[in-house]
Design a protein with these regions (language model features):
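N-terminal Rossmann-like dinucleotide-binding module
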Residues: 1-40
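Short, structured coil segments at secondary-structure junctions
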Residues: 22, 55, 96-97
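N-terminal beta-loop-helix "entrance" segment that forms/cooperates
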Residues: 35-53
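Short, structured active-site "lid" loops
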Residues: 47-59, 79-82
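Glycine-rich, highly charged phosphate/nucleotide-binding loops
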Residues: 58-68
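Short amphipathic alpha-helix with an adjacent loop that forms part of the alpha/beta core around
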Residues: 66-76, 95
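Donor/substrate-binding cores of folate-linked one-carbon enzymes
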Residues: 79-148
Length: 148
């Protein structure tokens, strides 16, 4: 596979990006735009943004992923790996990848789909949790699960 894009934002996604980057060439990393945080309200880059800079990877931070439709189309995508990216991905973007979009989700789907699955597992005293691999469709965390 030669045309891979990674989409992610939080710290949870950092070791996954690093591991994939060791074995495959990642064409570009998409993450959320820097946001104001802390008392000084300074703009802060996401953990994935900082990691991708350290790995010398190209970075895109669109407010809406559809803004990058033409760019993604030109990449002739083979696979897109998504880890807690924070945006719903439209059908027209999903159709650009030959092998689809693979989501790595921090819960045993279908339980705790959506945002903050780790926190919700803890708050609900789950005895067992894990990670799910699923193909992305147009709905939130509802595509077919490949592995848990």
């Amino acid at each position: 596979m030669s045309n891979i894009v990674f989409m992610g934002t939080p710290r949870f996604a950092v070791p996954i990006l690093k591991k994939i980057n060791q074995k495959y060439k990642i064409n570009c990393v998409f993450t959320q735009p820097p946001s104001k945080s802390n008392r000084g309200q300074k703009f802060t880059k996401s953990p994935i943004h900082t990691c991708a800079e350290g790995l010398n990877l190209e970075i895109k931070t669109p407010k809406k992923i559809d803004e990058e439709y033409e760019y993604l189309k030109e990449l002739n995508l083979d696979l897109v790996i998504v880890v807690a990216y924070g945006q719903l991905i439209s059908k027209k973007i999903l159709e650009l990848s030959k092998k689809g979009f693979l989501n790595i989700h921090a819960s045993l789907l279908p339980k705790w789909r959506g945002a903050a699955p780790i926190q919700r597992s803890i708050l609900n005293n789950e005895k067992k949790t894990g990670i799910s691999f699923m193909k992305i469709d147009e709905k939130l965390d509802s595509g077919p699960v490949c592995n848990k």
